[in-house]
């Protein structure tokens, strides 16, 4: 299967939106949150023995799933590109929630890539690729006009984040393990360099960065009692900036 061909793919994920009264809007928002929660908590945590957060979609942080859904809907994304598949927990979740969106996931470890490929072999919208994430992004990212990048390949000795960001030209990049300035959320540091706004803007000087508003009241609590990862939501281009600025779950980090 080759979803990411040179001809590209134009797809839209179904996302319920209501018109009419605010009451109707609230009902739809509630139903969507319930739908996401069912998919989120039914996803097997295959990475539970590997990752410090116990695995699961988005490190078992359902608030990250809610924010991602808002980004996807408001951006009208035409692809999801994930780096750092591991065993496919997040990929599994995304493939079920957005069955009409092409999803590319990149993993450098051969055994993990093969596990994820077998796990997701029945998902026609998913392609798992073994390889260097920045190299794969360079070859594929330009084929889409409104992609969401989920960059989570920055845990090994080789930190590919800078090279990944150098390939991003449009859309929204979600950077995992980012320093959001809150004690509850962890972040990565390699060779004395923290995963922070300065690191991102070295590669994307014209970008704008948002982070989660920790005071936002979500419909469901986050059940991750261990390590929670901070995340940056990076807008490249005016459409992406307009998208992120419209999401009440986020706050500007600039």
Functional labels for PLM-detected ranges:
Residues 1-148, 153-254:
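A short alpha-helical cap/connector motif
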């Amino acid at each position: 299967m080759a979803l990411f061909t040179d001809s590209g793919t134009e797809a839209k994920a179904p996302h319920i939106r209501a018109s009419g009264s605010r009451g109707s809007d609230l009902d739809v928002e509630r139903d969507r949150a319930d739908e996401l929660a069912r998919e989120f908590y039914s996803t097997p945590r295959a990475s539970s023995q590997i990752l410090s957060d116990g695995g699961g979609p988005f490190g078992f942080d359902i608030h990250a799933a809610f924010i991602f859904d808002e980004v996807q809907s408001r951006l009208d994304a035409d692809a999801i590109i994930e780096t750092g598949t591991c065993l496919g927990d997040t990929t599994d979740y995304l493939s079920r929630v957005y069955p009409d969106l092409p999803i590319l996931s990149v993993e450098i470890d051969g055994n993990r890539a093969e596990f994820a490929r077998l796990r997701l072999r029945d998902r026609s919208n998913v392609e798992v690729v073994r390889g260097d994430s920045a190299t794969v992004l360079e070859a594929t990212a330009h084929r889409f006009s409104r992609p969401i990048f989920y960059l989570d390949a920055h845990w090994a000795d080789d930190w590919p984040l800078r090279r990944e960001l150098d390939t991003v030209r449009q859309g929204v990049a979600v950077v995992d393990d980012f320093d959001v300035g809150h004690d509850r959320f962890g972040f990565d540091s390699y060779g004395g360099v923290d995963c922070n706004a300065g690191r991102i803007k070295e590669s994307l000087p014209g970008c704008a960065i948002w982070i989660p508003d920790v005071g936002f009241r979500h419909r469901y609590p986050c059940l991750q009692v261990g390590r929670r990862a901070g995340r940056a939501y990076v807008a490249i281009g005016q459409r992406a900036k307009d998208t992120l600025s419209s999401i009440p779950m986020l706050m500007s980090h600039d």
